[in-house]
Each structure stands twice: as C-alpha cells, then as structure tokens.
Amino acid sequence: MVCDIYDALPVEIWIHIIELSKEFNLLLTNTKFIKLYYLVKTHKSILKKIVKNGYFENLKYIIENRIIVITNINDVLLLACKYGNLPIVKYLVSKGADICAEQNSPIKNATYYGHLDVVKYLVSNGAKFFGSYSSAIIIASSSGKLDIVKYFVPGKIYFCLEMEIALVCATENKHTNIVDYLNSMRSSYFDKCFNFIACLVKNFLPSIYVY
C-alpha cells in the first residue's frame, strides 16, 4: 500500500511534501521512501529520530545498504546510549563503534540518563571511568539514578573523596533517596572499620608490648 502511494507522485513532489510538512517519519515507512534521505534537508533530524525511537531495523537497513553514510559511528553510539536502546548499542559496537570514545562518553551518557541495562553491557565489554567507577557514582548521584549508584557501589567500599563528592551532589540536587543510601553505606563502612580496628587491638597489640 505504501509503495503504491510512493509511485503515485513524482519524487520531487514527495520531497516538497516531506520538507514542508516536516513529516520525516514518512522516510521510515518503506525502502523507497528511505532512499529520499539525501534529497531531504533533514539528515541529523532523521538519524536522531531513528535512534531515539528505537527503530532498530530501519537503522540496520540504512547502514547495511549504505543509504546513509555515517562518517562517525561513535556519534550514533552516543545517541543510543543517551536514549537507552540496548539492541542499537550492541549493533553499533558490532559495527566497530568504540565504547570508550570521547573519554568514555558512551557509559557516561548511559549513566547520566539512567539506562542500567546499557551501563551493564558497556562495563561487561570493558568500558571504564578513567580506571575506576568512582566518577560513575558522582554522575549517577547528580542525576538521581539510585539503581545505577547501587550498581557501582561495591559491598566493601572505601569512601574516598569521590564518594564524598557524590554525597554532596545528591544533596544539592535534592535526591534524598541517594543521600540516605550513601549515608547508610558510609555508616556501614565505618562500622566495619571500627570493628576491624577493635579486633586488631584486642588480638595483636598486647603481644608486642615489652615488659
């Protein structure tokens, strides 16, 4: 049916219709319309729309058939991580996208926008925050993503400067659930430290005294 509609009008008319109406979704309806991509003045808009709405099959088709020549596939990966579309993220990585591009921006995007499934995938494939996950906790705390904070905070954690910054960021942004969680983890950590030191004093220090 869509093919019949396409054939009913000259290409030039369809281009004018799409540009004037801004109905760019029409380009995604079938393979004939998508071939108008380079004739319509909406390159960035349509690619962003494809990724944002999770049109995986459309993206796959236009890339593999070279309907769209993507000069930097990492830019598309950043969009996919921002909008949290895991199938598209996996596909782009399989096509050579760098999960550590632009100083690990893919995982930063996924963390900030709260896409835990994408974060887990990127971490499992080697994505890092400059060698540690501390910066991830700061980003997740700032944006209010408790599930991601919990993912990055290990069971035994050393509350160094980054953790204190995360607590400040969560407080300033009024993410009380994260503030409560980080405070509880901090209390738990210091309790463990106190018990460890008490045990050390009780069991080892008396033996080093000289009488």
UniProtKB/Swiss-Prot annotation:
List the Gene3D superfamilies: Ankyrin repeat-containing domain (1.25.40.20)
Which InterPro entries does this UniProt record tie to the protein? Ankyrin_rpt, Ankyrin_rpt-contain_sf
Keywords attached to this Swiss-Prot or TrEMBL record, sorted alphabetically, are:
ANK repeat, Repeat
ANK repeat spans: 31-61, 72-101, 103-131, 133-162, 163-191
Pfam families linked to this entry: Ank_2 (PF12796)
Top-rank taxon, per record? Viruses
Q: Which SUPFAM superfamilies match?
A: Ankyrin repeat
Please give the PROSITE patterns that the UniProt record associates with this protein.
ANK_REP_REGION, ANK_REPEAT
- Protein name as catalogued: Putative ankyrin repeat protein R810
Query: In which organism is this protein found?
Result: Acanthamoeba polyphaga mimivirus
Lineage at the top is: Viruses, Varidnaviria, Bamfordvirae, Nucleocytoviricota, Megaviricetes
